[in-house]
Amino acid sequence: MKRAEVLLTCDRTLMSNYHGNEFVGFGTCAPPNFIPEWFYSFLFFPPIKTSKGMPVAAPYGLRKVEAQLLKEGFSVVTVTPDHIKEHVNDAKIIGIHTMDPFGLGPASTTLAAMLKKEPYLAKYFQALLSSTAIKEAKKKGAKLIVGGPGAWQFQYRPRFVEENGIDCVVEGEAENIIGKLFRAVLNGEDMPRYYEASVKEAPSLGEVPDIVGPSINGLIEIGRGCCRGCEFCNVTLRPLRWYPYEKILREMSVNKAGGVNMCCLHAEDVMLYGSRNTVPDDAKLTRLHELVMKNCNSISWSHCSLAAVASNPKLFSRLSEIIRQKQAWWGAEIGIETGSPAIAKKIMPAKAHPFKAEEWPDVVKSGMGILHDNMMVPACTLIVGLPEEREEDVLKTMELVDDLKGCRSLIVPLFFVPLGRLKSRDWFRKAEMNKLHKQLLCQCAEHDFYWLDNLIDLAFAGKWYVRFLREFYRVFAGIAKQKTRQVEVDVLQ
């Protein structure tokens, strides 16, 4: 059994491959519901396979921390939450990766408000921190450090931090500071309760280590930062960097050696790989996909922008041809956010670039049509309750959703969460919803139900080993439709 001074882990909802489909992972944002918890967890976040308590794949962010600490000479072990006890005896530091620890993210907040329960991802994070293994390690003097994309939420839960003995919360890109913090702990030095890595501390391309263990579903970062500057987003505060092909292929080889033969290209806008502005680079993007497809069995994207797609339909079609040599479809998360040109101009003026912000609804319709024709299935987000939103803005968004009824997609409305340059603004809460907001939520639900059976067929086509799951998802979808329509009646009254 591997002993180490640093133990890394995360909660049960993050240590899963979601049956090889990232879309399925969105089920962790929902609260407990009409499906028994044991069966719901099997459907939406089955436990990752392990070898001696160590996961065969782990969240990419956790793998990056692991790689950086190993690079700096620490002894490190990454384990699943169910196997902490076997590995924790020698650990002086327990590092926990978080995504949405309190369910304060947009999707979780919206579902929790509508269903009036705490989401699974928050429930399992809190179960991890209250576990016997963690508490016993703390009694023996182990220090508890948390980080990851969900680190910002701890600022809103100071009492939780105190009561659960969290010694340090690390927010931001940590490569250049994590070793110093961990070394200080081992030397018995004081450390801050909260540490937010500044832009100056962000690593250069050469300072970001390659992962040394496989990432869940083959997720590979191809770049960091974003040039669009939307006011509601944290990522725009980071410098834009694109990784060279060689680095991406090296990390793919790590995944492949560990038995992970799929690849999810991760960036805030995959369509802008290699570009220094909002115009796609045809040559670099095409070459990237040719290289990646030679080295994996399937590909997906984490995010892309509709403006980049609409600005170069021929390039997108070419990428679709490359990708669909081995698969029928692929997916990505895409931010629509609003159908109002006025709101687009105020808080996300560059999101439509190289088009004008006033053209945003037309950009969305054009981009979504191109995605549909090329078998890209987007999970789209809308933001409900944006600052300075008026009734006419909500009506514009409703008109846009209606125009998208023929586009194969999921459209998910999310309550506004104060992040980025808008972090000083107030949260949007269910009590603030007006009649139009409620109608918009119901409209999105009906859009999603219309496409759900088709998406289930696509998601599990050709996968004999999960074919039986398709029928369970169909049953779940059918019951969810009935339950949601009951909620719709209550909401609209």
Show the residue positions of the predicted features:
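Conserved SAM/AdoMet-binding glycine-rich loop
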Residues: 8, 253-378, 384-389
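Catalytic cores of alpha/beta
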Residues: 155-164, 315-319, 387-403
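Glycine-rich beta-alpha loop elements in corrinoid/cobalamin-binding modules
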Residues: 61, 77-208
